[in-house]
Amino acid sequence: MKIAISADSTCDLSNEICEKYDIHLNAMPFSLGEDDLRHDGVTGTTKDVFEYVEKTGKLPTTSAYNEYEYTEHFNKLLKDYDAVIHVSFSWEISSTGANARRASENMQNVYTIDSKNLSCGFGLVVLECAIWAQMGKSVEEIIKHAEEVRDQIQTSFLVDTLEYLY
């Protein structure tokens, strides 16, 4: 069975890793002002965010993919794959994961996993799924392994300033 591994771009995996492990990212939307919608890693970068904050003193706003957008994303993947496993960043922090889950509930062979993590912790769960998919493991084996790995991850970070946190 050919399994696609999908995730939101906030997993912070490099393009090189995504290409090597066949990981399909959703570029998460964010706005730098009222009329400046961008997509993470596609039309906007971390550098853009820092420059915007320095220039305006304002933080960017983010939005979640809706169910329709996830359905479109999953259907596109199902054209080339037998199943899709989508990993989202913590469902407690964003509606993104809930929207992906609701979209998957109306589809066959689409599964969602709550990484219960952010950033690199989230990325580790995604990477483990991709490695196991390349090893030829089943959907059930990949999900079970991802949940075991997820429950062992603890992510910490230090910041130079609280300016970008809210």
Region locations from a protein language model:
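Short Gly/Thr/Asp-enriched flexible loops that form oxyanion-binding sites at enzyme active sites
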Residues: 89-107, 124-127
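Short glycine-rich or small-residue beta-strand-to-loop segments that form or flank ligand, phosphate
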Residues: 83-90, 111-114, 128
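Long, charge-dense
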Residues: 113-125
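N-terminal glycine-rich anion-binding loop in soluble enzyme alpha/beta folds
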Residues: 4-64
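Glycine-rich, highly charged phosphate/nucleotide-binding loops
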Residues: 62-72
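Internal, active-site/partner-interface "lid" segment
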Residues: 132-166
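Short, well-structured alpha-helical segments in soluble
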Residues: 72-80
